[in-house]
Amino acid sequence: MAKQLLFDDTARKALERGVDALANAVKVTLGPKGRNVVIDKKWGAPTITNDGVTIAREVELDDPYENLGAQLAKEVATKTNDVAGDGTTTATVLAQALVHEGLRNVAAGAAPSGLKRGIDAAVDAVSDQLLSMARDVDGKGDIAHVATISAQDPAVGELLADAFDKVGKDGVITVEESSTTALELDFTEGMQFDKGYISPYFVTDAERQEAVLEDAYVLVHQGKISTVQDLLPLLEKVLKAAKPLLIIAEDVDGEALSTLVVNKIRGTFNAVAVKAPGFGDRRKAILQDIATLTGAQVVAEEVGLKLDQIDLDALGTARRITVTKDDTTIVDGAGSSEDIAGRVAQIKAEVERTDSDWDREKLQERLAKLSGGVVVIKVGAHTEVELKEKKHRIEDAVSATRAAIEEGIVAGGGSALVHAVSVLEDNLGRTGDEATGVALVRKAASEPLRWIAENAGLEGYVVVEKVRSLEVGSGLNAATGEYVDLLAAGVLDPVKVTRSALRNAASIASMVLTTDTLVVDKKEEDLAVNGGGHGHGHGHGH
């Protein structure tokens, strides 16, 4: 494929136009008075959103050079979203400001490498300052405020405060679409997996069609159980202990299953068999999770444990197990808290390592099931367009709240950045182009606040100067137009979101400033014209 090249200042200007196109589309959504953006879809209703990363993902420009700039700006939004789950618009606005001012200085003769060193040093200093300004999330009130600011809806804030109260910071909160118009919260205590009883004869509560085992043993088996000889020695021991038994295995069939069913019907003892969830390596991992939670050992040939040789100490126990035809819930497993904490740490390390979104989601689910439960928030709305927009806002709010619990909170409304750059007053002792790089960050940091104010119909630069003169923690509440103590008023931002936005913006801006050449594919029509197609037919009609 033939390539086109663009060099020097012309190349950087093209990148800047691309960054501008994307940033201008995104920054109108900033703040409580921000506008929405409507995105056309190839099929179905258009999407209405005020989420920076959703808008950014849709932007593709016609000019290939400008498109490179837009894609770089898109990277700012997606990276911030991956790390913090929110703050994508802030990150894009910061990147635009750094690129603008930076390129002006490069055109005036500043060395891009010097600017980059200054920017990096400034970002590190501001990032540390933000951390020192942060305070820990304190109870449901703070969580409700953070979620309210992110979703721009107090009802969502209250609901998420309840959700996190129930499942803790590692718990899974999933957002699903509902057929009603209401917002609802479903909480599942303990570990639940999507496999039910193998035979309906195991049911203990005929009315609810579920099997309930109180204070039960749990057998976790990696293979199939078909022959009753393998199972009999264990069943006799369980019978003596007079406790019910849950069997989780790849499958239970043949005479092993019929023996369990017959004994259940006769009332000799109460047992329920369910298939293991998942498949392949994921099934092995989930079985180990269940074993850790209940204090069991996974019975498998590969670890030298045979079913006909095990004692009761290889079984786990749980206070209550409920099995329906579709799923199994284990509440209060007897696994030791150290083992569970170790398993949780191991899964967290896997989450950090994985590149696949699907794997990450599945690992997060396993994490939640080990650490306390699952909340499902059901979102309803009057139209499909409104439903999608609402669901998106709530997902963002969940991410923002999680980020807040992790690293703490600072005053919102763009004021934390304006106050944090006070550490750059002396340009960090740098000189020359590095000092200019530090100054770039100091100037760019006020842009999110300026656009929050502009979108609220106020004079941006005036607001920035006013907030700068206020003490740390105070700023503009754009929803009311008043200058208040933002921490007291509940206008809060997760510090992780603000730091990620600044870091990712600086990273992309530095790339643009140090770029000198752009290489893109030549367009098809250019190739056709230059190739001079001489394939004309000369058929003469008689």
UniProtKB/Swiss-Prot annotation:
One Pfam family hit: Cpn60_TCP1
Enzyme class: isomerase
Keywords: ATP-binding, Chaperone, Cytoplasm, Isomerase, Nucleotide-binding
EC number, as in UniProt: 5.6.1.7
A GO molecular-function descriptor: unfolded protein binding
GO terms, biological process: protein refolding
UniProt subunit comment: Forms a cylinder of 14 subunits composed of two heptameric rings stacked back-to-back. Interacts with the co-chaperonin GroES.
Protein name, as recorded: Chaperonin GroEL 1
Record organism: Kineococcus radiotolerans (strain ATCC BAA-149 / DSM 14245 / SRS30216)
UniProt lineage: Bacteria, Bacillati, Actinomycetota, Actinomycetes, Kineosporiales
Gene name as annotated: groEL1
